[in-house]
């Protein structure tokens, strides 16, 4: 047997065909579902096979033959996770092997483990770049930091890392967007709000202290020249200059006497360190582009590793939660802290999370696409921004549940939007009134006079919203063309009928048998509607008739046999809706 590839175990020889007992099949299914939960829909056959053989050692001699069944069940479990969400995987596992969920509960405790170090006065921070609104990926930082802050009755700082005026410049509106989105996502206001651009005097002061202390210097080498020094582990000539000379050049940098790209301030470390990224790393550079808040007041701006390190110390940050790809930032900043004689905060890391439906988006890329009119704006329903998700009808509770589910793991994982949609369904279902939406409608006339004048349909099938939708209707109704077959059916929540081409005869108001149930709509209670459905880079539009009963703009409804959608606008001719999810 060789190592698993693409999550499936392969064998060098064809296994013999064995018809497995239902008991063995159930064991394999149990561990496949359990593994899919642990790996967020990317279960591993090798791991599943190991667990099966651990529980049933008598199967070890048949391991090769077992591979086919294991691969099949792992593929099935992963497909359920992708198409229906993790809650569906968990539901199936709980239905026949609830004890297998205990392992997940233990792992959740690990995923949301206690913070290391001193936790009496916890201070955390969430530090976005205000070059656009928050994305679903950003929301992880809001949620996880807020969760820990709440657990330890600590403080959370919202810090805008906005000291890049050239590559990813700030958008002035984004400050308010992000602050409001932070509150929406976390359910609370940040304890402190910091705009790094307004803290420039602090960074300039610390840079001067660093240069005066001899552990920072002005480097006049070009980027290519210093790259060669770094690769060869040699010190550049600028490193040995007197402090006074460095301070003179620092003054020239600050006053605009040196052009962009001609000088940087570096942190003196060790040019022989094994990690090239740590060798005399750049702390401040020249940027003459104006800033949307402070204008052209400053010519020298700190790079993120320096600015973030200084501000973390100034705010008393005790724990930093960041991506595992930023470990080098921790190492750089630790060296700077040692120079200043400070104690570095406790770092925690998480791995990347890829969401299948949103593979290649970046904030700067989205902005470019908005400017080129590929997207209508930051709330375009095809985008993974919080603005877009919120506009479609996703709740902050569902986003919190998603990140709580994933926890603080250093593993890179890949999930489907179906997982978030599953959480959102659970959160909003009890507050969503039901309505009917008929696609490709067919008109049917009642051929009998024994129909009541009013049909009373529950606002919510489980009664969480009291009251009924009382339909007063005429002789005609609409049904969906896919349901238009001559024969006996039940009109949902109304009557047993027999359809004969384009007419229907009521047979009984009570349900008398197990005939198919179809949804329907009185003609006089119908309005034309369009539902806009995001589909990758496309927007599909589905036309039909909607139930015209107490509709409200901005409200999410569940349309039976169709899914959740939000009403965007209502006029005399048309109701426009935005698709949410199944």
Regions found by a protein language model. Give the residues of each.
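N-terminal Rossmann-like or analogous alpha/beta NTP/dinucleotide-binding catalytic cores
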Residues: 4-238, 324-348, 352-357, 363, ...
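Extended, domain-scale alpha-helical bundle/helix-rich regions
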Residues: 39-56, 60-63, 377-459
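Active-site cores that bind ATP or allylic diphosphates and position pyrophosphate for catalysis
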Residues: 209, 213-366, 372-374, 385, ...
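C-terminal accessory/binding modules appended to enzymatic or scaffolding proteins
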Residues: 119, 450-582
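Short acidic (Asp/Glu) and glycine-rich catalytic loops that position anionic groups and cofactors
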Residues: 154-158, 186-187, 309-317, 365-366, ...
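Structured alpha-helical segments in the cores of large, soluble enzyme domains
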Residues: 140-150, 175-182, 296, 300-308, ...
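Charge-rich, well-structured scaffold segments of protease-associated domains
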Residues: 173-184, 209-212, 395, 405-408, ...
């Amino acid at each position: 047997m060789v190592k698993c590839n693409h999550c499936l175990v392969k064998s060098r020889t064809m296994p013999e065909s064995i018809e497995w007992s239902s008991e063995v099949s159930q064991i394999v299914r149990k561990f496949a579902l359990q593994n899919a939960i642990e790996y967020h829909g990317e279960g591993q056959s090798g791991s599943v096979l190991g667990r099966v053989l651990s529980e049933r050692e008598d199967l070890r001699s048949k391991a090769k033959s077992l591979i086919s069944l294991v691969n099949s069940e792992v593929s099935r479990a992963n497909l359920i996770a992708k198409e229906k969400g993790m809650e569906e995987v968990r539901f199936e596992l709980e239905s026949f092997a609830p004890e297998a969920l205990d392992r997940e509960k233990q792992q959740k405790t690990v995923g949301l483990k206690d913070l290391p170090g001193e936790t009496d006065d916890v201070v955390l921070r969430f530090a976005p770049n205000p070059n656009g609104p928050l994305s679903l990926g950003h929301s992880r930082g809001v949620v996880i930091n807020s969760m820990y802050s709440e657990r330890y009755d600590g403080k959370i700082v919202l810090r805008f890392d906005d000291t890049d005026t050239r590559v990813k410049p700030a958008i002035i509106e984004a400050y308010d967007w992000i602050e409001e989105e932070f509150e929406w996502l976390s359910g609370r206001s940040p304890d402190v709000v910091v705009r790094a651009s307004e803290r420039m005097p602090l960074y300039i002061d610390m840079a001067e202290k660093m240069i005066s202390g001899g552990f920072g210097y002005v480097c006049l080498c070009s980027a290519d020249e210093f790259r060669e020094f770094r690769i060869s582990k040699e010190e550049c000539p600028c490193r040995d200059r007197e402090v006074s000379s460095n301070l003179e050049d620092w003054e020239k940098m600050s006053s605009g006497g040196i052009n962009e790209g001609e000088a940087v301030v570096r942190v003196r470390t060790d040019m022989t360190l094994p990690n090239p990224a740590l060798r005399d790393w750049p702390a401040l550079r020249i940027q003459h582009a104006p800033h949307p808040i402070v204008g052209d007041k400053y010519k020298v701006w700190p790079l993120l590793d320096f600015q973030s390190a200084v501000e973390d110390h100034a705010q008393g940050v005790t724990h930093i939660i960041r991506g595992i790809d930023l470990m080098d930032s921790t190492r750089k900043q630790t060296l700077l802290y040692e120079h200043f004689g400070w104690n570095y905060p406790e770092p925690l890391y998480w791995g990347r999370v890829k969401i299948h439906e949103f593979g290649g988006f970046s904030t700067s890329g989205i902005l470019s696409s908005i400017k080129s009119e590929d997207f209508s704006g930051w709330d375009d329903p095809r985008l993974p921004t919080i603005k877009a998700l919120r506009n479609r009808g996703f709740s902050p509770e569902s986003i919190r549940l998603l990140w709580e589910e994933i926890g603080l793991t250093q593993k890179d994982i890949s999930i489907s939007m179906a997982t978030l949609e599953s959480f959102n369904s659970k959160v909003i279902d009890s507050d969503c009134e039901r309505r009917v939406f008929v696609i490709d409608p067919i008109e049917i006339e009642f051929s009998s006079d024994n129909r009541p004048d009013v049909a009373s349909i529950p606002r919510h099938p489980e009664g969480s919203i009291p009251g009924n939708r009382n339909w007063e209707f005429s002789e005609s109704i609409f049904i969906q063309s896919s349901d238009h077959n001559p024969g006996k059916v039940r009109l949902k929540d109304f009557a047993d009928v027999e359809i004969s081409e384009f007419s229907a005869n009521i047979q009984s108001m009570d349900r008398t048998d197990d005939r198919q149930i179809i949804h329907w709509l009185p003609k006089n209670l119908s309005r034309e509607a369009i539902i806009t459905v995001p589909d990758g880079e496309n927007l599909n539009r589905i036309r039909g008739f909607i139930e015209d009963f107490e509709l409200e703009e901005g409200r999410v409804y569940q349309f039976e046999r169709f899914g959740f959608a939000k009403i965007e606008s209502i006029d005399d001719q048309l109701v426009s809706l935005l698709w949410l999810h199944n």
